[in-house]
Amino acid sequence: MKLIWLNHWFSTAYNIIRLIRDSDPGYTVIGTNENEESPIRAVCDEWYREPKLKGREYADFCLDFCREHGVDVFMPRREMAAVSREMDRFEALGVRVMAEKYPYVELFGRKDLAYAAFREKGIGRVPDFYMVTDTGKFLEAYEALSERYGNVCFKFVRDEGGKSYRLIDNRKRGYASLFKKQTTRISLEEALDALKEKEPFSPVMVMPYLPGDEVSVDCLMTGSGLIAIPRVKDATRIEKVRYDDEIMDTCARFFEAFPLEMPCNIQFKYLDGIPYVLEVNTRMSGGVQMSCAAAGVNIPGVAVAKLLGIDMEWKCDRTERSVTHVEIPVVL
């Protein structure tokens, strides 16, 4: 019996745990979270509340937790960088950690560094961008990009899940705007006013808005080759698994240059029919279960087996198909 621990994950890890159980019902799963009523609790064998710690202190907590509970596989999301810094200490305990070595976590946690690496190694296409820390440079970047591309967006370099992402929209808000979600839209004036409150501010990446389809590719390198399942996302709940040759080639070249061992997610967005690399997340995506369902591949299960030294057989059904999800009640 192997014991698997998932720390503070987003709620869709509910599906990741179910996939792990599907691959081997003998696994025991521990979940921890700051939120006592996280839906993940419903699919865990054991459940504990996490302390509110950061950085090295949090990594120390994780080491102690692994030691006390006899954890075999640790799947971190919270403070992944801090955990990966201490990878040697986890390995000394005999704990397999589903995280990349720290240099990769740091590289792909910084979009500016990642874009520079992609350009240096000729991996796909990346958008033009400016890095700014004051409103003067922000305005210069906006003017240069808007003249060339039209619409401009920005986000903080240190961000997860796109929480700071904003699209600059200077159109007057009228009656029609009441029927549209405005949470990611902000005028240039509003953006400048907000950024002035903490100037110089944390690095912000300013780039053209790419209006085409967003493609999320769930990936895992295995002993049998690369699993790469691209999901085309739009504003609806219906996603399409579509194997674009350029995207698949870019993913293959990415793994040749950066041999990541753990599950990751590579995101693209289209502009004028051309896919641009947006970012690489060194963890499973929140929608990995959609890819698994469409392609018939259990990425979480294969990844756990890989950490345990098992080369699990898999076969990817590359039929292009639509996939969606529905809300289900979860009693906590």
Task: Kindly label every feature range from the protein language model.
Residues 40-42, 58-60, 106-112, 162-163, ...:
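Short, charged, surface-exposed secondary-structure boundary motifs
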Residues 178-254, 258, 269-270, 274-276:
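Phosphate-binding site of ATP-dependent enzymes
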Residues 105-203, 223:
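Active-site nucleotide/adenylate-binding loops and adjacent lid/helix of ATP-dependent enzymes
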Residues 1-101:
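ATP-binding N-terminal substructure of ATP-dependent carboxylate-amine bond-forming enzymes
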Residues 7, 69, 237-249, 253-332:
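ATP-dependent carboxylate activation and anion-phosphoryl transfer catalytic cores
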Residues 70, 94, 149-150, 259:
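Residue-level detector of structured alpha->beta connecting loops
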